[in-house]
């Protein structure tokens, strides 16, 4: 090893086994939602308006709008349809421009854009999702994720070979 330079291993044995330290279990740090937190957001919490709706923002971005527990929809913006629908409710039924979305966001709504997933070197244009921080099974080869591709909206497990987006959150005091 040359002085001042780190050493690297090309051994396949060390790939994917190095510990990763993050703020996931540290107070007031950014982290990824757990499986139970995704389930809570989508399925079990009580919300005054609804928990979520599929939407199409700015004429080009599909995704999911998450509504806060106490949400009042802006009176001059068309209310979304298909609230809490996990079936094939169309994204295009709820189309919002920049001005409309700004009002919804000011009222507390959050938008999760539908980013394509990856499978090895391939982009999968029919599967969208966000990883959770919860592993599935004993081997750690799979994890739970929020799946909202096609006609589905659920929290389920998938091999970590697939590449999904992550959404970082930070607890608010």
Residue ranges and their predicted role:
Residues 5, 10-12, 16-173:
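C-terminal, surface-exposed recognition/capping segments
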